Amino acid sequence: MQHKLLINGELVSGEGEKQPVYNPATGDVLLEIAEASAEQVDAAVRAADAAFAEWGQTTPKVRAECLLKLADVIEENGQVFAELESRNCGKPLHSAFNDEIPAIVDVFRFFAGAARCLNGLAAGEYLEGHTSMIRRDPLGVVASIAPWNYPLMMAAWKLAPALAAGNCVVLKPSEITPLTALKLAELAKDIFPAGVINILFGRGKTVGDPLTGHPKVRMVSLTGSIATGEHIISHAASSIKRTHMELGGKAPVIVFDDADIEAVVEGVRTFGYYNAGQDCTAACRIYAQKGIYDTLVEKLGAAVATLKSGAPDDESTELGPLSSLAHLERVSKAVEEAKATGHIKVITGGEKRKGNGYYYAPTLLAGALQDDAIVQKEVFGPVVSVTPFDNEEQVVNWANDSQYGLASSVWTKDVGRAHRVSARLQYGCTWVNTHFMLVSEMPHGGQKLSGYGKDMSLYGLEDYTVVRHVMVKH
């Protein structure tokens, strides 16, 4: 397995402390990787800064060609990437290969095209004798911090728009799941000029802090927890860096009496438990109108009970393990606290799986109340709660009564209600009669404590640029 860092176009061994990387399906150590030293972090940033002098002046065509080449090599090595992701994250291999790899390739190809469509406003004379124009220019060095739930996907979401806009990047994947990013480093080094992409390994304290606080870094992009976002924003404040934050969610799923219950059950069975629920947009907080509440709980419980947890390389496996032992304990604690309330009923699941690995049973909890922690706090595991509601006004208020604001969905056959409720929900995305669907052309991002800034789409590309005014006297 490729375990070297990419700094200034060269693969080099880390000079810091060695850290174990685990296989969550077994609990075994896959390998140990040496972290980047503080000197290597500095070298990576300075290499990116030096490379920006030329890369920032390249044409969109040149940048697009590089992104397309990277997309091609990822596609060609799709099986290798999927196997690494499966071993390091515990994802079902078929899901990694069939779902994630094509989406990752598409992200790079989308931004290759978008790079050639980014324009400033047309020139005009707003002062007599002077012509003004608006430019969208790259910022410089971008520090990108990727999470452990979708390591390669999130690396793509961060690298593609930043590079397309003409920035240079220093990427730090999660120390829990670094293997696909390090493999990407091996392939990218021969496509992009030295220093344009740098990929490091290490923990937040030892590598993340010196990276995000570096004076030559002009922007920090994070997908992670609220706590990590707060830390990075504070850490970057003294140098007034731009920050781009995607900080998790607790998606409300509003099911009205007139909804297609079979579609809801099928949807939540998939969208609430995909990737073992380790997804910021997971359909995890259901509000069911009282007329269909009992039916939904019964049918959904039966459906969730059929989800198969198992070995990642088994074609029939639907849920793999959680990412780490520490995260397994967090999920277990959240469910135990819910059970201890006395009014929350475990419909199915509610316990760790016996045996090796970090497995938690797919869990459905009914009877949750609005103020319960299981409703208000992100669990980030295969755990879905159901809360009954009376009417539209009540459920909109409850849905918005959350510190999160990333994703939501509304299930109803009433088109007017779908529009009305969607307009009032304080979430970056609202799906109607579906959930979880993402495409490269549409923006992804939240509000409130879920963060700010957009991934994907032309809006995502614009986030990695600075607007400049140039005025020419005639």
Curated annotation (Swiss-Prot):
SUPFAM superfamilies: ALDH-like (SSF53720). NAD(+) binds at A146, P147, W148, K172, P173, S174, E175, D209, S225, I226, A227, T228, C280. It catalyses: 4-aminobutanal + NAD(+) + H2O = 4-aminobutanoate + NADH + 2 H(+); 5-aminopentanal + NAD(+) + H2O = 5-aminopentanoate + NADH + 2 H(+). Signal peptide: none annotated. The keyword Cell membrane does not apply. Belongs to the aldehyde dehydrogenase family. Gamma-aminobutyraldehyde dehydrogenase subfamily. Homotetramer. This is Gamma-aminobutyraldehyde dehydrogenase. The lineage of its organism: Bacteria, Pseudomonadati, Pseudomonadota, Gammaproteobacteria, Enterobacterales.
